[in-house]
């Protein structure tokens, strides 16, 4: 496990702290950022966004949130590789490092959602077209943020918070969508509502319960053999969006499990990225 500051990882112009001072509510971990051997982050003292700029920008930006059950952030498998792949397609990519609920923040289970809203606002302050792409728990977080742009999860900090955190589209890859029974075994469920939540708490953190006709166009991809986030999560979100009149496309992958990122070349899990690229190119 490595420990280092974000200043040593990125040039200052490439990393933007989310908050002007300490994050809402205060508290949080101390010490340096922790990076595991596979590139997963934890001990998130200073949440922010890392920008990847392509050689020939197409005028569209994608905010990426990697997963990790709200216990860590899978930068090495999902964040950075996906950002560089999007760069190859002309998209400016922003990779979000968000606060983790179990790291002693005073605002508890709200902190990642606060960071998601703030990140969308921050990217909107720099870009005209903002698309969201979330994986696993990161998909839960961005999917929920896309559904609740008018919800004030924190008190305004500065002028950036006057921007409505709306997205132009949402891509959710093997996402956690619902925390309601029988889908209660995930780390996302444990991190956000614990072992013995009320039905109201589980419903409050379930993305599908906030979908309206105003939800952005949605792309979903998940493997049928995903034993971490039940594939029914994507089915529930797909069907909810269809009923609400939201444009939605879902890719069902025959094999791949969970957490495959871009997918290994030559495997069924490697099909989603090009399908997403075609879909995203059609979003105006």
Model-derived segments and spans:
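Short beta-strand element of the alpha/beta-hydrolase
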Residues: 59-68
